Amino acid sequence: MRRGMTRWRLVIHGGAGSERIAHDDPAHEAQARAGLEEALAAGAAILERGESAIDAVETAARLLEENPCFNAGRGSVLTEQGEVELDAAIMDGRTRAAGAVSGIKTTRAPISLARRLMEHGPHVFLAGAAADRFAATSGLEQVANDFFILPERRRQLDEALAAGSAADPIKYGTIGAVAVDADGNVAAATSTGGITAKRWGRVGDSPLIGAGTYADNRAAAISATGSGEYFIRAVAAHEVAARIRLGCETLQQAIDGVLADIASLGGKGGLIAVSPSGDAAWGFTTPAMYRGMADASGRTVAIYSEETER
């Protein structure tokens, strides 16, 4: 999908995966669409008021983290040990400031922790207990790990462990938001629970600046979803931005080219992006991807590849 230019724009995703992500459960599909609408409305309201892209992407991502339909925050998938470990990153294209966290177990809002680290921390990336301690000392809400765990996720873990190496970890997962504000500044945010039955300490592409998340006012803001190991190897988000900066591809061409490269390695997934001029694009190589867009003309959400965006 590719749209023309407008004053501001917000694009979000709730993960790319197999077609069964919603077709098997109409109630889940309705809840997921409502969750996308809620996140779009909140982020769009910020941009309509002339506020910043970084505020918009944090707000949209925070709402998606709170929605148990998506694999981020509450409702995330479980590790091999039956716990939730969360990853998140945020980046401001105006300054290229960034914050990233991984292995989060007790901080309710990982994306807000990533922003707090970006704005007030001494480092760009914190992991594990140190990141949760930074969150606690920064006044961010702490919860028991059980807060994030849903019975359905325990069932999925049991199935994955029983299937062993035959299990397919790419169902759906990760949430993300990219935005351009009225001043032409772009920002990106990505948050995830990872993949079901992941090994303790596994880190995917989402919190890695340049792999799953990237923003640069000279090019675009990008958020990724999919088989993280392949997106890391392709440095996917930065590669989209680099192709734009070279000036030889449109935003849509850059996304399609990077996804094709990832597919050649054996990976699948999706990307969303916006440019400082207000252009927006997305693409995915799976049968479905939760996604939505808001601009001055309205809002739209979609899931399946056959759906046509307005």
Feature locations, PLM:
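Alpha/propeptide regions of enzymes that mature by internal proteolysis
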Residues: 2-310
